[in-house]
């Protein structure tokens, strides 16, 4: 979630432009869990929804941690290193993920350890330029690939992030050094971005985050992230039976996350209606300087199609799968 994000003092429109046209930096409410031991990748491969065994040191992926009933416990970034696999997730999901791993360990030669870390996000088309100007000698190339780097005088783990709006990177820093890392990035052209601007960028990119747009009440097929978080070629893992059953039914679910063009600003939790009947609810709302009022939210399967007309708080709204293709007119 974005609980650590606050207003920066700058105008949200300026922050938005920085994230869309240049580079912006945010502090993310995430933490890490280290998994070590000789069978660490085998173990995680059997626990998470994506292919962990196929990753070499320096590579990574995103995955879902699920219950046996398919409930989403967390979105996890998996970073394979030479002697450890680092799992990055929301701070409030570290304990549930650790509990699930411990419960399924059953004698497997793996060990778990949490450690203090601050996680920063750097997004925008000039993010790479900022990093190089700040001292990073090279940038990770593949999505969720990573390596050690320096920003100014501070060591960081630098990750090419696939869960930020647009091109972006995530940096893992020691907590006592995080302010220095952030200040160095800002000194080399990154602008601080607060929640209001980031929400607009996330909604435009249809970039859902766990805790804000997704909870334990959701199934992976409802999030629009199945192709990102799931490998269809791997064997058994926790929650696999539910995924396979849904795939056998064509992936059909009763509700799914969609974008919405709104006729007026709204707030998260506001119901989506159609024909006087409830048809969903909003999860993230924003006023985009480019598009006006927009949102992400869940809609009933009868309104999955782009262009479906619904209402939010009695005001007409329209379902969107791609905001850029939908154009700038309401």
Question: Residue locations for each model-derived region?
Answer:
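Acidic, low-complexity central loop/insert segments
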Residues: 24-27, 31-32, 77-208
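Acidic, proline/glycine-enriched N-terminal capping motif
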Residues: 1-73, 79, 322
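Short, solvent-exposed amphipathic alpha-helical segments in soluble enzyme
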Residues: 47-53, 101-106, 136-137, 185-190, ...
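Short, conserved active-site entrance elements at the starts or edges of catalytic domains
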Residues: 201-224
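Glycine-rich, small/acidic residue-mixed loop/short-helix segments
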Residues: 1, 71, 218, 223-240, ...
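Short hydrophobic/aromatic beta-strand micro-patches
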Residues: 34, 88, 172-174, 261-263, ...
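Short, surface-exposed ligand-recognition loops at beta-strand->loop->(often short) alpha-helix junctions
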Residues: 34-40, 122-128, 261-267
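Short amphipathic beta-strand starts and helix->beta connectors
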Residues: 12-21, 64-75, 103-108, 149-159, ...
